[in-house]
């Protein structure tokens, strides 16, 4: 079977670096903004950098939001990266209160820490709850972050990994077939590639 991952293009992400990472591990992926192509895929990646309200507006413009909600709820492996993870939640307070995709319960809030914001650079993972995409990833593994907002979870059972930055910041979350990755796996060396390979192997 010719498995393929749809990387969603909605003008809010560094798509090529994500695709290159999948190419490197031998995973078949393609970049698209077409709902029909997304529906034909075997798994979905929602990358993203930028502001939450702009991202939701862009997803809604051509109905991609409804497509990915339906595909995720129907059990297709789905992962959001960085801003893409934050979009999975119910709403965000970034700029103005904006509703998200509502696939994982919780709200995106402005980071409160005595450390510099944005949280940018390498930080280590604590892993309180294993999940499929963290297979082979050890506690203390370093990954690369760039963000100023964090996920406040409605259900702590959705938390798989976090980092310490003056406060606990969720780094990996999941609910059934849906995963959120706050850091950039495509910029996180072998650990990041392991996580992307684990996602590919869910198909």
Curated annotation (Swiss-Prot):
<keyword id="KW-0378">Hydrolase</keyword>
<dbReference type="GO" id="GO:0004359">
    <property type="term" value="F:glutaminase activity"/>
</dbReference>
<keyword id="KW-0028">Amino-acid biosynthesis</keyword>
<dbReference type="InterPro" id="IPR029062">
    <property type="entry name" value="Class_I_gatase-like"/>
</dbReference>
<dbReference type="GO" id="GO:0000105">
    <property type="term" value="P:L-histidine biosynthetic process"/>
</dbReference>
<keyword id="KW-0456">Lyase</keyword>
<feature type="active site" description="Nucleophile">
    <location>
        <position position="82"/>
    </location>
</feature>
<keyword id="KW-0315">Glutamine amidotransferase</keyword>
<feature type="active site">
    <location>
        <position position="184"/>
    </location>
</feature>
<dbReference type="InterPro" id="IPR017926">
    <property type="entry name" value="GATASE"/>
</dbReference>
<feature type="active site">
    <location>
        <position position="186"/>
    </location>
</feature>
<comment type="pathway">
    <text>Amino-acid biosynthesis; L-histidine biosynthesis; L-histidine from 5-phospho-alpha-D-ribose 1-diphosphate: step 5/9.</text>
</comment>
<dbReference type="Pfam" id="PF00117">
    <property type="entry name" value="GATase"/>
</dbReference>
<comment type="function">
    <text>IGPS catalyzes the conversion of PRFAR and glutamine to IGP, AICAR and glutamate. The HisH subunit catalyzes the hydrolysis of glutamine to glutamate and ammonia as part of the synthesis of IGP and AICAR. The resulting ammonia molecule is channeled to the active site of HisF.</text>
</comment>
<dbReference type="GO" id="GO:0016829">
    <property type="term" value="F:lyase activity"/>
</dbReference>
<comment type="subunit">
    <text>Heterodimer of HisH and HisF.</text>
</comment>
<feature type="domain" description="Glutamine amidotransferase type-1">
    <location>
        <begin position="4"/>
        <end position="203"/>
    </location>
</feature>
<dbReference type="GO" id="GO:0005737">
    <property type="term" value="C:cytoplasm"/>
</dbReference>
<protein>
    <recommendedName>
        <fullName>Imidazole glycerol phosphate synthase subunit HisH</fullName>
        <ecNumber>4.3.2.10</ecNumber>
        <ecNumber>3.5.1.2</ecNumber>
    </recommendedName>
</protein>
<keyword id="KW-0368">Histidine biosynthesis</keyword>
<dbReference type="InterPro" id="IPR010139">
    <property type="entry name" value="Imidazole-glycPsynth_HisH"/>
</dbReference>
<dbReference type="GO" id="GO:0000107">
    <property type="term" value="F:imidazoleglycerol-phosphate synthase activity"/>
</dbReference>
<keyword id="KW-0963">Cytoplasm</keyword>
């Amino acid at each position: 079977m010719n498995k393929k991952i749809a990387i969603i293009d909605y003008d809010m992400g560094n798509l090529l670096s994500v695709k290159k990472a999948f190419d490197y591990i031998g995973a078949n992926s393609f970049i698209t903004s077409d709902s029909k192509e997304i529906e034909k895929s075997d798994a979905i990646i929602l990358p993203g950098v930028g502001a939450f309200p702009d991202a939701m507006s862009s997803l809604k413009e051509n109905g991609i939001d409804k497509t990915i909600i339906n595909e995720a709820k129907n059990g297709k492996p789905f992962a959001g990266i960085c801003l893409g993870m934050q979009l999975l939640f119910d709403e965000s307070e970034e700029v103005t209160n904006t509703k998200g995709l509502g696939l994982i319960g919780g709200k995106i809030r402005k980071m409160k820490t005595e450390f510099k914001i944005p949280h940018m650079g390498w930080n280590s993972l604590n892993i309180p709850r294993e999940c499929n995409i963290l297979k082979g990833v050890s506690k203390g593994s370093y990954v690369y972050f760039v963000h100023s907002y964090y996920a406040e979870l409605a259900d702590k059972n959705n938390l798989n990994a976090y980092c310490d930055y003056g406060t606990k910041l969720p780094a990996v979350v999941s609910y059934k077939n849906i995963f959120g990755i706050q850091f950039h796996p495509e910029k996180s060396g072998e650990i990041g590639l392991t996580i992307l390979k684990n996602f590919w192997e869910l198909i």
